[in-house]
């Protein structure tokens, strides 16, 4: 694995090849930093703020998860889940009881674009029926690639690392605009994207291909392009995860990551994309549940760190937009303090929006207690009401900036004219065609000639192997599919090997084959063992890595290796085009690929990529 710190300083320097040195925080140009959105306060927003009770103000700072696919009705299981969390049945009732600032959608909330638009409109109607008539923030994680809550027929953008492999800021902006316009068409007004983390650790279990790469300058360029694209599409972009989640081997969903960068390393590697985003006046920044001792030695995660969020982000970087937490049900923020204390600590640190309160060990929602804790903190003097007002005003101002007070509704009659249009789908495919990276072609197997050869497609993913097999069959091959999953056992490996023996070619699909730990939550060595067993048959083997490009370090003897960075239909079509020479592989690695267990040795450098 890549955990040891031996030779790590040299490794960091190598992975961020080409990174431009940045000045210390004291050298940030205040004239270029984000100015306050308005020189004075907006009278309408101030009237709304003054009309709010303390409870209303505190509730406006929460963005909640709700179960179901409609604002007013829900399946019995969803009703039961909502009752455990909020004591009511559905989203409209949550609005009526608590008046929260907004909601976040997950995949379980989505059936199709028309359903989602109706859901969003139901939430906004419920908000409009309340005395304050404050529209709801409706947010989602729609990063593209492996993180997409809204699936086809919506357009599927290449993910961050794929776009960075294509090196086109034009594609990054265009696909963000398309994604933003399709989200706004279904009533979503905030996207928790783009990801500004600089992924310098191949063993990062939570970021990986969600990052634009290991080079701060490249990441900065792509992030700023996407900020403009999302805004043009009509949604609020949110860069994440400040102060930078790119160098960890711990998933903040399940543990507390520690980032061991020195202050100088942080300024050189992690800071530049966020600084660039602030210069673009990005509307929203999401915090990370990570501990960074060089920035705050207290051991508090950044989400709860006043030195990081106020001392650095507000005071030194002059950020004036909305600060939103990562989800509060993640272990990275729950480990040190009790759930009821976390919102107060986050607000004291400098947070504005509190995302997705958790359930307790009995499955009951903590949100009502967290809401009461914020109110009581003001009453006791632990927080001032002025501090709450600052955050509420920023939230209201952002809603106004997105036009929500004017018209928060989706036009349900126009969804088909915006979502998944032929023009949007074609743009996504063109972008994907620029991302596929041919990392190794030592045996000269590629490009393949169309024809009746027998091809085994095996490895990870029922739909992935089937889709890639279909694309190969369209080129005249006779394909056999043997899906083996993330953690193939010996029986599955033996079955794939037996199927390979009478084939002319084997295409093996891998997904994080580097994650070889034999522990719960990890893939184990099965994928690596599968590839090595297939190589031992003597059949020509082409490996297609459909997630992290680092897999080849676990089977460096493979002669032919492609990286697609995701497994969308567009990515797999592009891979097939490259396999058969219909498309010259244009992608270039946006990260370096180090040797297994030798992070100081780079197998394939940043920028590597072969052509025909």
Question: What is each residue range found by the language model?
Answer:
Residues 2-5, 22, 33-93, 315, ...:
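Preference for extracellular/luminal or secreted protein segments
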Residues 110-135, 167-187, 386-397, 433:
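Active-site-adjacent structural elements in enzyme catalytic domains
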Residues 67-71, 108-112, 142-147, 190, ...:
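Solvent-exposed loop/turn segments at secondary-structure junctions
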Residues 1-18:
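N-terminal export and membrane-targeting signals
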Residues 48-53, 77-83, 87, 112-132, ...:
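Second-shell residues forming the walls of enzyme active-site clefts
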Residues 59, 65-71, 91-113, 202-203, ...:
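Short acidic, glycine-rich surface-loop motifs adjacent to enzyme active sites
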Residues 59-66, 101-105, 136-142, 190-194, ...:
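Hydrophobic faces of well-ordered beta-strands that scaffold small-molecule active sites
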Residues 15-26, 141:
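Bacterial N-terminal signal peptides
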């Amino acid at each position: 694995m890549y955990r040891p710190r031996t030779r790590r300083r040299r490794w960091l320097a190598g992975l961020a090849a080409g990174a431009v040195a940045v000045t210390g925080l004291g050298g940030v140009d205040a004239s270029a930093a984000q100015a306050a959105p308005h020189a004075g306060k907006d009278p309408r927003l101030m009237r709304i703020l003054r009309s709010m009770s303390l409870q209303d103000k505190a509730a406006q700072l929460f963005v909640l998860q709700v179960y179901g696919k409609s604002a007013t009705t829900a399946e019995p299981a969803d009703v039961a889940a909502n009752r455990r969390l909020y004591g009511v049945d559905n989203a409209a009732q949550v609005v009526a009881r608590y008046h929260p600032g907004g909601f976040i959608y997950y995949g379980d909330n989505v059936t199709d674009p028309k359903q989602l638009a109706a859901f969003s409109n139901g939430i906004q109607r419920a908000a409009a029926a309340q005395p304050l008539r404050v529209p709801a923030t409706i947010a989602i994680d729609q990063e593209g690639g492996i993180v997409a809550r809204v699936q086809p027929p919506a357009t599927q953008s290449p993910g961050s690392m794929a776009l960075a492999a294509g090196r086109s800021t034009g594609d990054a902006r265009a696909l963000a605009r398309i994604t933003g316009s399709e989200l706004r068409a279904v009533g979503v007004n905030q996207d928790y994207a783009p990801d500004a983390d600089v992924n310098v650790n191949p063993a990062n279990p939570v970021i990986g291909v969600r990052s634009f790469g290991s080079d701060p300058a490249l990441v900065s360029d792509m992030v700023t392009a996407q900020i403009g694209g999302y805004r043009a599409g009509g949604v609020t972009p949110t860069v994440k995860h400040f102060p930078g989640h790119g160098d960890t081997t711990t998933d903040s969903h399940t543990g507390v990551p520690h980032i061991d960068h020195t202050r100088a390393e942080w300024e050189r590697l992690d800071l530049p994309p966020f600084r660039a985003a602030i210069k673009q006046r990005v509307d929203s920044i999401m915090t990370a549940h990570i501990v960074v001792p060089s920035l705050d030695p207290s051991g508090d995660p950044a989400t709860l760190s006043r030195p990081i969020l106020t001392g650095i982000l507000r005071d030194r970087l002059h950020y004036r937009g909305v600060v939103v937490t990562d989800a509060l049900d993640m272990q990275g923020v729950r480990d040190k303090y009790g759930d009821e204390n976390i919102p107060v600590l986050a607000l004291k640190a400098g947070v504005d929006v509190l995302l997705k309160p958790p359930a307790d060990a009995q499955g009951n929602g903590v949100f009502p207690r967290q809401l009461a804790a914020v109110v009581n903190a003001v009453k006791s003097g632990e927080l001032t009401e002025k501090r709450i007002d600052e955050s509420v005003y920023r939230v209201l101002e952002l809603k106004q900036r997105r036009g929500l007070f004017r018209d928060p509704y989706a036009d349900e009659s126009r969804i088909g004219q915006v979502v998944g249009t032929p023009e949007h789908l074609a743009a996504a495919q063109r972008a994907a065609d620029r991302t596929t990276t041919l990392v190794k072609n030592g045996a000269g197997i590629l490009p393949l000639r169309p024809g009746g050869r027998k091809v085994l497609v095996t490895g990870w993913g029922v739909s992935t192997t089937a889709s890639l097999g279909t694309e190969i069959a369209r080129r005249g091959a006779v394909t056999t599919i043997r899906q083996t999953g993330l953690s193939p056992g010996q029986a599955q490996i033996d079955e794939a090997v037996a199927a390979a023996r009478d084939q002319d070619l084997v295409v093996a699909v891998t997904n994080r084959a580097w994650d070889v730990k034999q522990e719960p939550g990890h893939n184990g060595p099965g994928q690596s063992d599968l590839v090595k067993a297939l190589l031992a048959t003597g059949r020509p083997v082409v490996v297609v890595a459909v997630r992290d490009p680092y897999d080849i370090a676990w089977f460096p003897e493979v002669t032919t290796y492609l990286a697609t960075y995701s497994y969308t239909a567009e990515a797999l079509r592009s891979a097939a085009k490259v396999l058969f020479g219909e498309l010259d592989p244009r992608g270039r690695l946006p990260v370096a690929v180090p040797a297994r267990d030798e992070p100081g040795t780079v197998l394939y450098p940043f920028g590597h990529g072969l052509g025909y």
